[in-house]
From Swiss-Prot:
HAMAP family: Ribosomal_uL11. Belongs to the universal ribosomal protein uL11 family. The lineage of its organism: Bacteria, Pseudomonadati, Pseudomonadota, Gammaproteobacteria, Aeromonadales. It comes from Tolumonas auensis (strain DSM 9187 / NBRC 110442 / TA 4). GO terms for cellular component: cytosolic large ribosomal subunit. InterPro entries: Ribosomal_uL11, Ribosomal_uL11_bac-typ, Ribosomal_uL11_C, Ribosomal_uL11_C_sf, Ribosomal_uL11_CS, Ribosomal_uL11_N, Ribosomal_uL11_N_sf. This is Large ribosomal subunit protein uL11. It comes from the Bacteria. Forms part of the ribosomal stalk which helps the ribosome interact with GTP-bound translation factors. Keywords: Methylation, Ribonucleoprotein, Ribosomal protein, RNA-binding, rRNA-binding.
Amino acid sequence: MAKKVSAYIKLQVKAGSANPSPPVGPALGQHGVNIMEFCKAFNARTEKLEKGAPTPVVITVYSDRSFTFETKTPPASFLLKKAAGITSGSSKPNKDKVGKVTHAQLLEIAKTKEPDMTGSDLEAKARCIAGSARSMGLVVEG
């Protein structure tokens, strides 16, 4: 028989650096999950990713206080900022442009995000990423 799910917890944790401090500790503690067990498992699973990259994670907590978790790819905004070499997007994206990204960079980001995106092909996913880039104040070239 399948275990009964008691909660889903969605967090964004830096890859390779999960620790019991907020936001991880309080979110897991209120559901009775072993926090250190999660931190060790998460850090082991994300050790191949770029250290410090924000990694969305969905934790499924079961009624017996056991858990499973699924990691996602880093947010498009993080990947776009890294590709453009900027620290933050524009506060006025329609007026102030803060950087440039090429079509090749968009395709590379779309390949990275492919498991978490919907879309018929890589080109459609790249167009979606291009929309995110424009809303951050980046100029899309090509």
